[in-house]
């Protein structure tokens, strides 16, 4: 894939990701990367908002989150998910229950709020009570 990548993580992991990606010759920047073929290693919500608002609507995009969102506090995941409704495709992996949170109910309500998507929720056979949520923009 040639295009823009956005990695959102804790500051220390963002720095580590930038270091590693640069060491293998990938154009990565700690923070917002203006290059449309680069990697932005972001750890601040404000920077994420900025990068997402500058996302080229004509280019294809995919959002991938493997267990990260389902393990975040509700206030943070709600803030995060409210910003990402303009991707072409989604892949979110999550466990049914995390702490006191019923993730199946949470993600069901979230996907219902995005009307222009076709959704498929699939249990991961080798990981009982874990799911892949696939979404595709239908417009």
Where are these regions (language model features)?
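Conserved S-adenosyl-L-methionine
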Residues: 1-5
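Conserved SAM/SAH-binding beta-strand->alpha-helix loop
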Residues: 10-13
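Carboxylate/His-rich catalytic cores and anion/metal-binding grooves
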Residues: 17
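S-adenosyl-L-methionine
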Residues: 20-56
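A short SAM/SAH-binding and catalytic strip from SAM-dependent methyltransferases
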Residues: 61-75
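A short acidic, amphipathic alpha-helical/loop segment
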Residues: 76-83
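Conserved beta-strand signature within the Rossmann-like core of class I S-adenosyl-L-methionine
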Residues: 86-99
